[in-house]
Amino acid sequence: SQKQRWLPGLASGETIATLAHAEGAGQTTAKSLTASLSGDSLTGAKKPVADGAAANIAIVTTTAGDGSVTLCLVELDQGTVVRTPIQTLDFSRGHATLEFNNASAEPLGNGTIHWSSFESLLDRAAVLMAWEQLGIADKALEQACDYAQQRYAFGRAIGSFQAIKHKLAGMYVKNALARSNAYHGAWALASDSDTRPLAASTARVASIQA
């Protein structure tokens, strides 16, 4: 089964997986999807794909034509898949464009999932990424504060200058706001609140701004 084949490698880190959903700028919806699966043949393009430059397998969203999407599993190390690296601000994720030219693919599990259920998965991912970004922002603030105390200019630590204090204070406020929204997003997921989509989006945006 797919679980027996892929989960051990994913758990050990030997296999890298990614989600290939976006198809360019703007929001990708069930109606706007153009990637299609015919039998076991996948055609279309996805961009940007986080970790697309390094991943071994991808879960690709394709149109089902009835308000649903079909999730298919694709091995990326095949000649019918073309990877084109994309330069982004996050060099750790190796973003890429993935082009599928009748690539061999198979439905993931039952294959078809209703769009509302897929949106729920995206909300969960948004909250998860919000916490990851908040952790990075917290570390950046910590390092900035340390540097401001260690670096001297005009005979005193630069952290004693009002402009630097205001900058660090602004960073702290943004981090605190992002943390509050991330907690709210986690609560909305755990309680299956009707506000989940808004809470997840708010957590994502606040963490980006932190």
Predicted features by range, described:
Residues 9, 13, 41, 120-210:
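Alpha-helical interface subdomain recognition
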Residues 13-24, 60:
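A short, Trp-centered hydrophobic/proline-enriched beta-strand micro-motif
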Residues 60, 72, 98, 137, ...:
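Residue-level signal for inorganic ion chemistry
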Residues 35-37:
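A structural signal for short hydrophobic beta-strand segments in well-ordered beta-sheet cores
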Residues 45-81, 95:
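A short core secondary-structure module
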Residues 1-8, 13, 50-57, 189:
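Internal helix-loop-helix
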Residues 28, 32, 48-49, 75-110:
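Flexible, small-/acidic-enriched active-site or ligand-binding loops
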Residues 10, 27-30, 49-54, 64-66, ...:
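Solvent-exposed alpha-helices and their adjacent loops that cap or buttress functional pockets
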